[in-house]
A protein has these predicted regions:
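Active-site recognition of the HExxH zinc-binding catalytic motif
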Residues: 1-15
């Protein structure tokens, strides 16, 4: 769902246009979620990571961009979705020239890297302001769930119950990970 808004985004930092990722955020992008879904530390569902600066030129990756278990959205994601104002997006950074440097005591990977600070104003300088802005953007969404069975067969009661379970979890996931700034329905039209 996040591909509707992200991640083909760049930032203009000191006159240089920096891609923040292709279809997902670059691995070195600091992208912690604003409203975690399952764990206290989660990287954005759109990619990037949660990075700890070790203050010695190395960075520990506390969470990565894998989707299992499900994760939420960073403030940058929420801004691009029209669910956060620019003032809500904290400064972040992108790590470039990542070189593996070991693992910490918990097994998290450590990298040497070059850190570049990025602000939402840098993103706006490259992409322009989000239109419509947070005050005028869409907040209610509707998605469909399709149940497929072999030709001539009807879906079983169990299959319908599973689809309804997915629907309920999807609606809860969306509300939680957007900080209840947006709602999702699953109503066939």
């Amino acid at each position: 769902m996040g591909h509707r808004w992200a991640a083909f985004v760049s930032a203009k930092v000191n006159g240089e246009t920096i891609p923040l990722g292709p279809t997902h955020w670059a691995r070195g992008l600091q992208a912690p979620v604003a409203f975690p879904y399952q764990r206290p530390t989660e990287a954005s569902a759109m990619g990037g990571g949660v990075w700890q600066d070790n203050t010695d030129g190395t960075y520990t990756q506390l969470d990565d961009d894998y989707y299992v278990p499900a994760t939420g959205w960073s403030y940058l994601d929420l801004y691009l979705m029209g669910l956060a104002a620019p003032a809500e997006v904290p400064d972040f950074f992108i790590l470039r020239s990542l070189v593996p440097a070991g693992r910490d005591a918990n097994g998290h990977p450590i990298f040497k890297a070059d850190r570049m600070k990025v602000t939402i104003q840098d993103v706006i300088a490259a992409e322009g302001p989000r239109m419509p802005d947070v005050e005028h953007s869409q907040k209610q969404f509707n998605t469909g769930i399709v149940v497929v069975v072999e030709h001539g067969n009807k879906p079983s009661k169990e299959l319908i119950e599973r689809a309804n379970g997915i629907r309920e979890r999807w609606i809860d996931y969306w509300a939680t990970t957007t900080g209840h700034r947006s709602s999702m329905t699953v109503n066939p039209k």
